[in-house]
């Protein structure tokens, strides 16, 4: 597979998957989702690969699923939205189900679907510039992969999701347990590879089985069924389309995404950043 929107290389048993649409803050479009799937196939099949690291090119991890692509394609109705949401969900969950450890290396914005991808990884190492969030409800969209309440608890997840938090600081993310380590921005890749190489020194079969055991502690409580139920609810949101989402997209088409985001944010009182 020829990659256009990601870069993929393997060195010293570490597969490095780079989201590479820096002009679009590495937004996850359909092509990128296909390429992530292809790269994960390669990493899982290659016995030399022991750890997968995902990072963003430039100064962002990713702004999430590509709103500009939605704006241009104009999906409407349940039949059009169902395969879109299913693909989004399945790609994010590749990192949860991958038999090899997965690490998200995050700098800058890590939002919406990209935030969900980082949550699906086994570890997240973040630069001091990183920030996180789930802004979807502020413009009438739903949550594709509802992992957050499983990792931070229902009360905090409701706060972040209901309020459309999009500037959750790296320090707060560390306090909540969704970031493992904060490192200087200039050393993000080096620090992440150091952790990855530590994992590479452990018997891969042992790591695989232990990952299964840890994931099972949540799956046994119903995580996978709950995620599928939440995905079905998201389809109920996106299928008919909300008034806010339609207004947001109309402004984006007429004036651009920056104008639509300004309209979105102007409707809400400014809150202290966390």
Residue map of PLM features:
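Glycine- (often His-adjacent) and acidic-residue-rich active-site loop
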Residues: 56-91, 110, 256
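A general structural signal for well-ordered alpha-helical segments in protein cores
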Residues: 88, 145, 154-157, 207-210, ...
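Charged catalytic carboxylate motif
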Residues: 31-35, 87, 94, 191, ...
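Ligand-binding pocket scaffold of soluble enzyme catalytic domains
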Residues: 24, 28, 74, 168, ...
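Terminal peptide-recognition signature
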Residues: 17, 21, 35-36, 54, ...
């Amino acid at each position: 597979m020829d990659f256009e929107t990601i870069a993929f290389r393997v060195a010293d048993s570490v597969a490095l998957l780079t989201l590479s649409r820096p002009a679009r803050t590495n937004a996850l479009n359909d092509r990128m989702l296909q390429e992530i799937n292809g790269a994960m196939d390669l990493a899982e099949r290659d016995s030399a690969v022991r750890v997968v690291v995902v990072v963003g090119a430039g100064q962002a991890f990713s702004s999430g699923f590509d709103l500009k692509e939605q704006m241009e394609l104009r999906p409407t109705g349940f039949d059009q939205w169902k395969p879109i949401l299913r693909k989004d969900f399945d790609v994010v969950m590749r990192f949860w189900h991958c038999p090899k450890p997965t690490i998200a290396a995050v700098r800058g914005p890590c939002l919406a679907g990209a935030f969900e991808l980082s949550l699906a990884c086994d570890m997240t190492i973040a630069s001091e510039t990183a920030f996180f969030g789930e802004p979807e409800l502020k413009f009438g969209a739903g949550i594709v992969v509802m992992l957050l309440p499983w990792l931070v608890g229902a009360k905090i997840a409701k706060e972040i999701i209901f309020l459309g938090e999009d500037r959750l600081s790296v320090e707060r993310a560390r306090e909540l347990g969704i970031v493992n380590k904060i490192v200087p921005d200039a050393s993000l890749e080096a620090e992440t590879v150091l952790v990855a190489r530590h994992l590479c020194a452990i018997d891969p079969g042992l790591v695989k089985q232990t990952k299964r055991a840890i994931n099972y502690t949540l799956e046994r409580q119903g995580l996978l069924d709950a995620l599928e139920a939440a995905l079905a609810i998201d389809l109920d949101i996106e299928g008919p389309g909300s008034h806010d989402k339609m207004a947001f997209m109309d402004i984006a088409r007429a004036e651009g995404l920056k104008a639509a985001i300004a309209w979105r944010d102007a409707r809400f009182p400014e809150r202290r950043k966390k």
